[in-house]
Structures are given as structure tokens and as C-alpha cells.
Amino acid sequence: MAEPDLTGQLEKMQRDWDERARENARFYVNTERQDWTDAEFFQSGERTVEEEILTDMINICQGKDPKRMTVLEIGCGAGRVTRALAQVFGRVYGVDISGEMVRQAKAAVADLPHVRIFQNNGKDLDVLGPIRFDFVFSSIVFQHIPSREVIESYIREVHRRLRRGRLFKFQVQGGSLDNSPEDTWLGVTFSEPDTQEMALRCGFEMRYSYGAGTQYYWLWFFRSKFPSRAWWLCEKYWLRAEYHRWRGRVSRALQRL
């Protein structure tokens, strides 16, 4: 169960983003302009995919046909990038903490049967059930989250859902800001050591990064193709304990003969 202060923070994030979505969802998703037309708004999502996805398909696909890949977008907002992802990948899922953003995103992808949108609680992916992903993406989302705990919770969740060897590509705030835990617009900032340590704690290899010290600090977190040493040791000792437990049972059974 989440701590009371974290629960309150998540509730505030949801309220604030619902309010922003009702006021002007497209502006708060992409602040380049306030009066987006449908065409312009979704074209801006296509540009994001061209810049951050299509130029990086070797890392993202690793030889797999993108039309056979299942991908997740964290913080899908009103569906700006989600629609563009659906042009590239076979199955696309999106999650967002705001119910109002989710409503608008569902309307935006209503004509795309291979896309599904869910409202989550802002810290985990339980709403998705047992689905595993070939690629996970998040852009201009974590820069708004005021809690390292929430961001790290998401990263651990992605590790749990991402197939071995696969990529979680995402952006965080790398600039120096005086953010407040109550501020759901200017989120927590990360340095290079912060992100390297976070990758290790969450079971990832941070293979590349770009934009450290800026608002657009991009990170390439790869899940290991092999179980970590810690996982291997746990399994080793579990198997040893199981062996001794069953050997004891067999020994007692033989004594009763």
C-alpha cells in the first residue's frame, strides 16, 4: 500500500491533470501553441515519432518486425504520440493518470482497433494485466512528476513488464529547477549519476543518454538478456532449500518402512 503522503501526491497529480485536460488538453500536452487543430496536433506526434522512434529502430526493434511488436506509451495524454506509434507498431497500449486525458485519447484512437488506452494510478501498471512488452516509450511525462519515488516505481514496473533485452526509452528533466513536491508541472530533476544509479537499482543497463543538464534528458534503459546475479543467487538458495526439504521428507518416509 502506498504511504499516505504518496497517496495524496498521486491524487493531486490526477486532479491537476484532469483540470488541465478539461481546460485545454492539447496545450498542456504540447505547449508549442494553444489553438491546435486536429491535423496539426497529431502531426506534432508524428514528428516526435520520426525524431525519437524512426531514427532509433535498431535499438527499438533489434531485428524484430515492428508490426509484430507490442509497445507501451507511459503518459499518453490526449493521444498525440499514440496515434503515430500505431502507424509503426502492431499493438499499442497507452496509460495515463488523468481520466479526462484518457477519455480524449480513446476518442483520438477510436478508429484504430490495435490500440488500447487505460487509466492507471500514476505509479504502476497493474491495470494492464499480464501483458509483456517489446518496447516502452515515454516523452515529456516524467518531467512533470514531482516525486522520484513515483518515477522509480514506474521504472521498476517497466522492468517487470519488458521482455528481456528490450528497451525502455524515456525522457526526464535534467535541468536545474527549484521544484516543489506540490508542483505537478515542474517535476523532479536528475543528474547523470542519479540516472545511472537508478538504472542499477531497477535492474536496467543505461546504455546511452543524451541531453544531460537540459529539459530533454533522454535515457536508453535496456533490460538485461540474462537474469541478474542477485536473481540467480536467490534461485540457487531457493533450489538448495527445496532440495534439503524434499530429502528430509524422503528420509523420514524411508524410516517408516
Regions found by a protein language model. Name each.
Residues 140-141:
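Short catalytic micro-motifs in class I SAM-dependent methyltransferases
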Residues 145:
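Catalytic P-loop NTPase motifs of RecA-like helicase/translocase cores
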Residues 152-164:
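A short glycine-rich, Lys/Arg-flanked "PGG" loop and its adjoining helix->strand segment in the class I
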Residues 137:
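A conserved beta-strand element that flanks and buttresses the S-adenosyl-L-methionine
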Residues 2-89, 93-126, 148-150, 167-257:
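Class I (Rossmann-like) S-adenosyl-L-methionine-dependent methyltransferase catalytic domain
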